[in-house]
Amino acid sequence: MKQQISEMRDILDNPSEEDDDELESPDQSNSGVPSDHHQGFIFGYSSTMVSMRSLHPSPSQIFILWEVFKENVDPLVRVLHRPTAKNILINASSNTDSLSRSAEALLFSIYYGAVASLTPEQCQSLLGESKDSLSKRYRFATEQALARAGFLNSSSLMLLQAFVFFLICVRHQDDTRLVWSLGGLAIHLAQALGIHRDGTNFDLNPFETEMRRRLWWHISILDTRSSEDHGTDPTFSEQFYDTKLPMNINDDDIYPDMKEPPKERVGCTEMTFCLMRFELSVVMRRLNFTAPGDDDPDANKRTLEEKEKLIDQCHRVLEEKYLQFCDMNIPYGFPFFSQLLS
């Protein structure tokens, strides 16, 4: 407790090293590379001297990045509906000026995530540029696109998807408190859109209900992992949401205009890996964290045997719902499930 109080005092009382420096515009850099400062977009700063069109990849690179995204990122982070995102990407390859601001932010976050998943050698081979240069460009472009779209005051689900996906990617490249801090902002933005309540409460169509569920549960994972990164308790509490888990389905099972929910699949699907992560995250929170004001008198008194029982129960659920159907020789098998332990 003393250590936590000391850390919080440091956050509040000690200005960061950047406080005395002016926020550098990307255009002021001698190298032409975007600045390493990333706070401006949070407050809506958008450089009027930067052409967003110039930050987009070429049409051929757009499809290379899309293939990388499908192969490396989408199986592990299922915030998006792949067919819908592909349609946006096809439009962008022919005319970026036709993109809505929300769609542009989403595309830049996809480019950034794709580059983040590549090695430096792969970036040079596939895209003809260094990973460092591409990462800085698409991170800056995503930040600019979010600011220009007014993400803090927007009611666009797509824009929130772009923001959350961006934070998930940044967390693996930035060890500052940025993602931990902005994760709380993502939760509040999601609550403002009512995403903490299941879509069936509002008679939303099955597609929108499903996409809201995916987004909410990825925010949950982000909150848990970023809290672990900085030794704090997660913000999430099961008492303040009723959003159900996403369905165990493939993207081809849903589409925007559908009227009836799809039949949930039995076995391994495109959503299975993420569903297992979501189920595990709930158990981990119950095992490791208890809200200071929790009214449940037993919450703080779980014995070792009770915790072991909770773990065994989780193992049975995962085995019965998912693992028994998974072929470890196919893409959605062992390579992905092994990451549950990382």
Regions found by a protein language model. Name each.
Residues 241-254:
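Flexible glycine/proline-rich, aromatic-decorated loop/lid segments
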